[in-house]
């Protein structure tokens, strides 16, 4: 990975941390670009560590272990590589090795609370108490949600931010909905609903956004749901009549103006004040998220080939040439 030998420390951190934003957006594309980058720089410890992160997001934990081992051979003091190695070992059910790896990483970086979380999970499993099946934790891990309906769909919104699509599982059946979401801390949150009326599972979908998860369940006919869940006797369905004011029922048992709520969330995100690295990361994540496939390819290729010193959205330019290393004027690029 490239680093600046002189100049602001924030720029150095930016060069080292920005690839994770690209990986989160499209782990498969990032995996391909990192593989190309490693063909040119086979001794780059950071590239191996970043590619291991791609494997984790794609669920390829054995490949992830191979990459972090190579990364640690090149740079034994990389706590991030140890964290990713431990996560891969955990999901491969090698809990003893995972615990040892997390403990080693914690010695290198005692400020990273991720090590505490994963060490606790390993210890609970080794002691014979699986945290994910604990009744008390199931209660604590229920997902908060709201719902509303249109003539054709029932829409459920899960109030969870900043999760990846690979960490979300939603299953539809005619009278039941279940969802499991792995949040950034590693904890599984779940939702299971016995629906008041049938839905069409094959035409029901979900979408993962930065601020929420939206689930759309297709109605077989245009009837109004008086509530979301139901068991036993079901009240006779009423013909759907569109509500002019968009006032919808919610799991909180009171009426809510959903359009107003969505507007408030968007306004809050728009006005959120970020500084330094956080502001840069948010800007580039937004460009990547909203960009076309060509824009994403251009950003991946330019960043990887230039060692983190160039970021281009112009595929017609960078697609036909190798992007050269071009650090800022007050910095010197070095390989480590």
UniProtKB/Swiss-Prot annotation:
All copies of domain SGS, residue ranges: 247-336
Post-translational modification: Phosphorylated at Ser-252 and Ser-302, dephosphorylation promotes nuclear translocation, most likely due to disruption of the SUGT1-HSP90 complex.
Chain positions of TPR repeats: 11-44, 45-78, 79-112
Any one Gene Ontology cellular component term annotated for this protein: protein-containing complex
Residue span, CS domain: 140-229
Cross-link (Glycyl lysine isopeptide (Lys-Gly) (interchain with G-Cter in SUMO1)): 266
Main location: cytoplasm
Pfam families per UniProt: CS (PF04969), SGS (PF05002)
Phosphothreonine found at: 255
Residue positions, PTM N-acetylalanine: 2
Cross-link Glycyl lysine isopeptide (Lys-Gly) (interchain with G-Cter in SUMO2), where in sequence: 266
UniProtKB keywords: Acetylation, Cytoplasm, Isopeptide bond, Nucleus, Phosphoprotein, Repeat, TPR repeat, Ubl conjugation, Ubl conjugation pathway
Keyword Cytoplasm: yes
Molecular function (Gene Ontology), one example: protein-folding chaperone binding
A GO biological-process term: spindle organization
SUPFAM superfamilies: HSP20-like chaperones, TPR-like
Coiled coil (residue ranges): none
Localization of this protein: Cytoplasm; Nucleus
Subunit structure: Probably associates with SCF (SKP1-CUL1-F-box protein) complex through interaction with SKP1. Interacts with S100A6. Interacts with HSP90.
Domain remark in the UniProt entry: The CS domain mediates interaction with HSP90.
Protein name in UniProt: Protein SGT1 homolog
């Amino acid at each position: 990975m490239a680093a600046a030998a002189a100049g602001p420390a924030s720029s150095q951190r930016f060069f080292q941390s920005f690839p994770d934003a690209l990986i989160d957006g499209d782990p498969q594309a990032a995996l391909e670009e990192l593989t190309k980058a490693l063909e040119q720089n086979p001794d780059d410890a950071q590239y191996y560590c970043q590619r291991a992160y791609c494997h984790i997001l794609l669920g390829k934990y054995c490949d992830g272990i191979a990459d972090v081992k190579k990364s640690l051979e090149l740079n034994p003091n990389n706590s991030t590589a140890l964290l990713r190695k431990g996560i891969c070992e955990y999901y491969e059910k090698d809990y003893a090795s995972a615990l040892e790896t997390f403990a080693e990483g914690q010695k290198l970086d005692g400020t990273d609370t991720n090590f505490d979380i994963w060490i606790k999970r390993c210890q609970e499993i080794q002691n014979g108490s699986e945290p994910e099946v604990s009744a008390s934790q199931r209660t604590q891990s229920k997902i908060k949600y709201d719902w509303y309906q249109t003539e054709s769909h029932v829409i459920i919104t899960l109030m969870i931010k900043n999760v990846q699509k690979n960490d979300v599982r939603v299953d539809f059946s005619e009278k039941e909905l279940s969802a499991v979401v792995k949040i950034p801390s590693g904890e599984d949150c779940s939702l299971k609903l016995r629906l008041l009326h049938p839905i069409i599972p094959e035409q029901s979908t979900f979408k993962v956004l930065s601020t929420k998860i939206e689930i759309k369940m297709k109605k077989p006919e245009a009837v109004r749901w008086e509530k979301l869940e139901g068991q036993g006797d079901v009240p006779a369905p009423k013909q759907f009549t569109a509500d002019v004011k968009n006032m919808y029922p919610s799991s909180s048992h009171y009426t809510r103006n959903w359009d107003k709520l969505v507007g408030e969330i968007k306004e809050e995100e728009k006005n959120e004040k970020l500084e330094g690295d956080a502001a840069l990361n948010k800007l580039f994540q937004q460009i990547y998220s909203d960009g076309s496939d060509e824009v994403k390819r251009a950003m991946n290729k330019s960043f990887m080939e230039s060692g983190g010193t160039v970021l281009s959205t112009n595929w017609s330019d960078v697609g036909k040439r190798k992007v050269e290393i071009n650090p800022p004027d007050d910095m010197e690029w070095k390989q480590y």
